[in-house]
């Protein structure tokens, strides 16, 4: 089972409730994006050929996750706290807004739940926050903007697919 943090029509960032691990679940058949903090049943695909080897959190699902309920932000805390990105480390292992695709080896995370100490500001499709004494302005994916709470405290940062040889940091969910 999954605690969905955010996503799109063919993927979601989630916490696997059985293991507590952060996962980027992907599936073939499109479905409406699941709202953050949705509890969903997953069916892991036997063949993981769709999983990207440089994205250690990738998991291929046989079917889209099936929503079975929702939880509150307060209840989700017990699953979110252990997967928070360490504040001593750069976002996704790199200080800049992008990572050269050829440098990705699968040893650094490609998905992170971030709790910026100064909060998050969202305006004009960008999330602005400070992390390690650097102000970041990352694009927010449209489904995340649609489902954003009024005052987000956390965000889910992931890497975009490669574009011009780089994977860009984007905000996949606002919590």
Residue ranges and their predicted role:
Residues 43-102, 112, 130-175:
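OB-fold/S1-family single-stranded nucleic acid-binding modules
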Residues 9-35, 99-115, 119-156:
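Beta-strand/loop nucleic-acid-binding surfaces
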Residues 1-75, 79:
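Long alpha-helical, hydrophobic tracts
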């Amino acid at each position: 089972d999954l605690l969905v943090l955010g996503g799109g029509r063919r993927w979601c960032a989630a916490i696997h409730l059985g293991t507590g691990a952060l996962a980027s679940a992907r599936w073939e058949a499109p479905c409406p994006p699941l709202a953050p903090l949705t509890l969903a049943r997953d069916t892991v695909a036997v063949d993981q050929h769709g999983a990207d080897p440089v994205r250690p959190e990738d998991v291929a699902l046989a079917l889209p996750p099936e929503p079975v309920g929702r939880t509150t932000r307060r209840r989700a805390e017990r699953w979110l706290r252990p997967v928070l990105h360490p504040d001593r480390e750069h976002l996704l292992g790199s200080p800049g807004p992008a990572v050269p695709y050829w440098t990705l080896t699968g040893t650094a995370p490609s998905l992170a739940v971030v709790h910026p100490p100064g909060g998050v500001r969202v305006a004009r499709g960008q999330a602005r926050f400070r992390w390690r004494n650097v102000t970041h302005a990352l694009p927010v994916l449209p489904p995340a903007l649609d489902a954003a709470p009024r005052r987000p405290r956390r965000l889910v940062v992931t890497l975009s697919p490669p574009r011009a040889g780089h994977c860009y940091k984007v905000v996949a969910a606002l919590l």
